Structures are given as C-alpha cells and as structure tokens.
Amino acid sequence: MSKPIDPQSAVEAMWKTAPRLAKAKAERVYMEEYRKSLKAILMKASGKSSAAAQETEAYSHPDYIKHLAGLQAAVEAEETLRWQMVATEAAIEVWRSQEASNRRIDRAAA
C-alpha cells in the first residue's frame, strides 16, 4: 500500500517549485525570442546577398546550433518542473477524493 498523501506537504512543494518553474519558463521564452535576434544577426553577418543564402548560413552557424541546444535544455527544465507541479496537483486531488469517500463512509456508518 502506498503512503498517505499529505496535502500540506504537497502545497509546500508547490510553493517551492513555483519560483523555479517561473524562472525556467522565463528562460525558455527568452531563448525562443533571442533565437530570432540571433538569426537576424547571423544573416546580416553572413555577407551573402540573397535572403535564402543568408538564412542557410545563419541556420548552419555554430552559434545558432549552440543556441538551439540551450533552448532544448531550457524546455526540458521547464517541462520537468511543470510535470512535477501537475503530479503534485493530482496528488492533492486524489487526497480530496479520498477524504470525500471517507466522509461518505462515516455518514453511512452513523
């Protein structure tokens, strides 16, 4: 049998996770937005005349590829924290359901 759910601990875990989740989301959004700026910077620096050639050069540039790896890490960090939050919320809902069932059993026994 699994250990009982402690709703107070779950809420405390949510309070501790929330700032980290917010920071991770901010980092992910920044990385997504900066990707556009980086592409423009690299296109301009490519020295190519056509937009297609500039874009190809920018997308294959090591700085752009490195940025994508950073974006990947930012998304992973955010999603990990988000799913921890979802799991904690689900645990609280399970506890609420168990408590409601216990109240029904108590009323039926009375």
Residue ranges of predicted features:
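Short A/G/S/P-biased low-complexity tracts
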Residues: 9-12, 61, 98-105
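Short intrinsically disordered terminal tails
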Residues: 1-2, 107-110
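Long amphipathic alpha-helical coiled-coil segments
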Residues: 25-28, 32, 36-37, 69-102
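Extended alpha-helical coiled-coil "stalk/arm" regions
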Residues: 28-58
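N-terminal cationic amphipathic segment used for targeting or macromolecule association
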Residues: 8, 50-51, 56, 106-108
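Short, charge-rich amphipathic alpha-helices with coiled-coil/heptad character
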Residues: 1-19
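Short, glycine/alanine-rich amphipathic alpha-helical segment
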Residues: 48-77
